[in-house]
Amino acid sequence: MKINYILFLLTAAFCYPSITVAKIIEAGSPDKKNVITIETDNQVSYSLSRNGTKILDTCPLSLTVGNDTWGTDKCRKVTRKSVSEKVEFIVPRKYKETVDNYNQVELIYKDYKIEFRVYNDGVAYRFVSTANNKQPVKKESVSFRFGQDHTSYTLLTDQLQNWFEQDYTVKPINALPKDSFSVAPVMVEV
């Protein structure tokens, strides 16, 4: 009986890391209108819904730092927090302060973490290094997969250096030319 109990504990201890972190994580905005669904199986990806309508569908993201690709290994831990704090502007604006209000999901990995923030009017993510050594960022990979063919306001250009003096092209996403560059920001009507 004691041997079976010890074998059970050993088996559970070895299996524990692989079953502790959920592969699908959801978080909503403070007003519950925006919902982000994060998948952590093999590669981090996210989907976004607003008022129950899917806006972005399974958008993978990763960051190549040194020789490592962040966002493709196993997530060790997931933490959550809600933030509502006043932020004072250093540079004078129309208002003296604003409220920073969001819900955050943090995916913790060996040498980095990925923070997703869900605001009432949008979402954001960022990669944060937790390692002591500094390595260069070589590449960021992200795709925006819209559920429908929405109208976009896009600054199309044939070069990456730009002074933002051209007109924006207003077209459905699928009508944009595949062989041209676009620079941020791009606005999409949903």
List the predicted regions and their residue ranges:
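Bacterial Sec-dependent N-terminal signal peptides
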Residues: 1-24
